[in-house]
Design a protein with these regions (language model features):
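N-terminal lobe of the biotin/lipoate ligase/transferase fold
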Residues: 2-161, 184
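Long, positively charged amphipathic alpha-helical accessory segments at protein N-termini or as interdomain linkers
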Residues: 2-33, 140-168, 178-266
Length: 268
C-alpha cells in the first residue's frame, strides 16, 4: 500500500521532533510540490493535529509525538493501537489465537501490567516509552525460538540508530543498554504444535524507555534503568519508532540470520 502525502508529511514532521521544517525541504523529501505539502498540512490540521505553519520557517508538529497509525506509515500487516492495555503481549497472543496474520503489530501508550522475563513487572509510564508486540508466524522448530529474541534485539538497535542516531549495547540475551543503563527489554512468547514441535506463532514484546525519568520508576529500578531522552523531548515519535522496529524485525524473519551482528553488539 502506497504512503499518502499526508502520511509521509506526518512521518517527516514526527521525525523532526517539534522543530520547523521548510516547505521546500518537505517537498523535496516527499517528492511532491509545495502546494501538495500545503494541502496535506491543511488535512492534518483538520484531523486535529497540532500542526503549526510560519512564514520563512515552514511547518512543525507542536506536540512532536503523534501517537497514531499514520505516524507509522506504510506497514504490511494490521496495526492495533491503544491508549492503554494490561500488556501488549497479552493482546497480541489473543490476536494470534484468533488467526491474526504474520506481522500484526500491537502498540500502546501505557501498560498497566507490563511483564518482562521470569514474570517480572515491566514499568510502562504513559506516553514515555515504546511498548509494542509483533506477531510472527515463522515455519521453524520451537527449539529455535530464542533466535527471534536475538533478532528483536538487533532490530531495536538498527531502528534506534537509524531514527535517533544512538547506538545501544546488548546484554545477553534480551536487555539493551544506553550509557550504562538498561533502556529496553524484550519478551518472546510462543505457541507450539506439540505433535510436530513446530511453532504456530511467536509474539515478540518490546519495551523501550524513551523519555522516562527516575521519578517514573520504583527506587530499586531507578538505580539501574535509563531512557534514551530522559525528560524529553524525543526527536522521533513513539509510533514511528515502533513501526521502524517492527519493520526491521520482519526483514529478519524467518531466517533470523543475524547472530554475528548480535554478538558485535554485546558490550556488557
Amino acid at each position: 500500500m502506497a504512503v499518502s502525502t499526508r502520511q509521509a508529511l506526518l512521518q517527516a514532521l514526527s521525525a523532526a521532533g517539534g522543530s520547523y521544517v521548510s516547505g521546500q525541504q518537505l517537498a523535496e523529501t516527499l517528492g511532491v510540490s509545495r502546494a501538495a505539502v500545503h494541502k496535506a498540512a491543511a488535512a492534518l490540521t483538520a484531523q486535529g493535529y497540532a500542526l503549526e505553519a510560519a512564514p520563512r520557517r515552514g511547518y512543525r508538529l507542536a506536540g512532536g509525538d503523534p501517537f497514531c497509525t499514520e505516524a507509522i506509515g506504510d506497514y504490511p500487516a494490521p496495526i492495533y493501537l491503544y491508549d492503554t492495555l494490561e500488556s501488549s503481549n497479552r493482546t497480541a497472543k489473543l490476536l494470534a489465537l484468533d488467526g491474526a496474520p504474520h506481522g500484526t503489530l500491537v502498540l500502546t501508550a501505557h501498560q498497566s501490567a507490563g511483564r518482562g522475563r521470569l514474570g517480572r513487572r515491566f514499568e510502562s509510564p504513559a506516553g514515555k516509552g515504546v511498548y509494542c508486540s509483533v506477531l510472527l508466524r515463522p515455519e521453524m522448530p520451537a527449539a529455535n525460538a530464542q533466535t527471534a529474541t536475538i533478532s528483536a534485539a538487533v532490530a531495536v538497535c538498527r531502528a534506534v540508530k537509524k531514527l535517533c542516531g544512538l547506538e545501544l549495547a546488548v546484554k545477553w540475551v534480551n536487555d539493551l543498554y544506553y550509557q550504562g543503563r538498561k533502556v529496553c527489554g524484550i519478551l518472546t512468547e510462543a505457541g507450539t504444535d506439540l505433535e510436530s514441535g513446530q511453532l504456530e506463532w511467536l509474539v515478540v514484546g518490546i519495551g523501550l524507555n524513551l523519555t522516562s525519568t527516575a521519578a517514573d520508576w520504583p527506587d530499586e529500578l531507578a538505580r539501574k534503568a535509563g531512557s534514551l531522552y530522559p525528560g524529553g523531548p524525543a526527536p522521533v515519535s513513539r509510533a514511528a519508532l515502533a513501526g521502524a522496529i517492527a519493520r526491521e524485525l520482519l526483514a529478519l524473519c524467518p531466517a533470523f540470520d543475524c547472530l554475528d551482528e548480535y554478538l558485535s553488539l554485546i558490550h556488557i
